[in-house]
């Protein structure tokens, strides 16, 4: 089971998923889209679900509001079992769960105001209630001045803000985001992510978003779940997963293996090898700078620095160094112990003959 947060009471998580499976029939075969998913999501947090295309992200998020019915398993929203609800109760539950989509799903023949008002009209609210609520959410997303315009007159980012406003009209407790920024340019993406953070902080709404972009996870998520072939393969607080990704798929998504080094790197020692190439990872609280001098001077030999990257995530400073040491017989365990006060991981990633 995956749970998050050391100070959260998980006796009643906002969303509780147990042994969730989803199987599709495709061309005479069974495709296992979700495999034994166990997940607790606390109230008021932003959870990011990341994975490659076809990993099972969309299948998972669509089960959370009943758009997909799982083949087996349990989904509870505040202890209410979603999988056994009848149609009428499922409709009521969906009003507590907003959803925004990659391609906006706006009605082109209706104005911005009418698009946002539509869910309330369908639910039978009176005109005064509809007007007050639509005006309120359009102001929240910064589009009150666009109320009478049509989708064709809006930018992609503005269309997505309309989608967010529409998702908020029923005062939802949960907001599901299905690749909400993948169709947007970087500037619009930044606006949408800032808006989602604002909604989470001001309204306390639990947000679950799926994406294939690690930058989205980095920007706004509290926790991250990595899905591969329908299974949760890695999870944790964002800073922790980013600083020390364990699974190959997570490392690939973070592009840690895509090194741009000015020489050929070999996995094994060969006749041309003169240096061991090492990756060093270190982390600290954001207000404490790493002591790079102590790290590099601990080797008692010349150290060649080929790559350095420092990032700040969730008030944690995360660093990666790629260095070269003119030794081929390094004892990594001894080095790890020697450097332990300054780093949390060191590994040999290959051997080379650098030209410096």
Curated annotation (Swiss-Prot):
Domain of life: Bacteria
InterPro entries found in the cross-reference section: AAA+_ATPase, ABC_transporter-like_ATP-bd, ABC_transporter-like_CS, ACT-like_dom_sf, MetN_ABC, MetN_ABC_transporter-like, NIL_domain, P-loop_NTPase
Protein name: Methionine import ATP-binding protein MetN 1
Gene giving rise to this polypeptide: metN1
Species for this entry: Acinetobacter baylyi (strain ATCC 33305 / BD413 / ADP1)
Entry's Gene Ontology cellular component terms: plasma membrane
Assigned EC number: 7.4.2.11
Reaction catalyzed: L-methionine(out) + ATP + H2O = L-methionine(in) + ADP + phosphate + H(+); D-methionine(out) + ATP + H2O = D-methionine(in) + ADP + phosphate + H(+)
Residue ranges constituting the ABC transporter domain according to the UniProt record: 15-254
């Amino acid at each position: 089971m995956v749970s998050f947060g050391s100070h959260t009471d998980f006796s009643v998580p906002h969303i509780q998923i147990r042994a969730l499976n989803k199987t599709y029939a495709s061309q005479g075969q069974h495709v296992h889209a979700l495999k034994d998913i166990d997940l607790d999501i606390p109230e008021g947090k932003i959870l990011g679900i990341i994975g490659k295309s076809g990993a099972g992200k969309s299948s998972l998020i669509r089960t959370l509001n009943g758009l997909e019915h799982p083949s087996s398993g349990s989904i509870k929203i505040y202890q209410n079992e979603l999988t056994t609800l009848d149609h009428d109760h499922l409709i009521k539950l969906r009003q507590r769960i907003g959803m925004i989509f990659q391609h906006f799903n706006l009605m082109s023949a209706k104005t911005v105001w009418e698009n946002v008002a539509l869910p309330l009209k369908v639910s039978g609210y009176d005109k005064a209630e509809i007007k007050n609520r639509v005006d309120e959410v359009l102001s929240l997303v910064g589009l009150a001045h666009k109320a009478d315009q049509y989708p064709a007159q809006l930018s992609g980012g503005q269309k997505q803000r309309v989608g967010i406003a529409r998702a908020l009209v029923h005062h939802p407790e949960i907001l599901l985001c299905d690749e909400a920024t993948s169709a947007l340019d970087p500037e619009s993406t930044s606006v949408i992510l800032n808006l989602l953070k604002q909604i989470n902080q001001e309204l306390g709404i639990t947000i679950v978003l799926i994406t294939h972009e690690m930058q989205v996870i980095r920007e706004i998520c509290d926790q991250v779940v990595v899905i591969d072939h329908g299974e949760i393969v890695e999870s944790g607080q964002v800073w922790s997963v980013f600083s020390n990704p364990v699974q190959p798929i997570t490392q690939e998504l973070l592009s840690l293996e895509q090194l741009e080094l000015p020489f050929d790197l070999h996995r094994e020692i060969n006749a041309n090898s003169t240096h061991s190439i090492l990756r060093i990872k270190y982390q600290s609280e954001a207000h404490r700078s790493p002591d790079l001098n102590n790290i590099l001077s601990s080797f008692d030999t010349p150290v060649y620095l080929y790559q350095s990257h420092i990032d700040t995530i969730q008030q944690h400073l995360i660093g990666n160094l790629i260095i070269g040491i003119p030794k081929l017989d390094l004892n990594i365990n001894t080095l790890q112990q020697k450097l332990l006060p300054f780093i949390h991981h060191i590994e040999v990633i290959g051997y080379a003959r650098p030209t410096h």
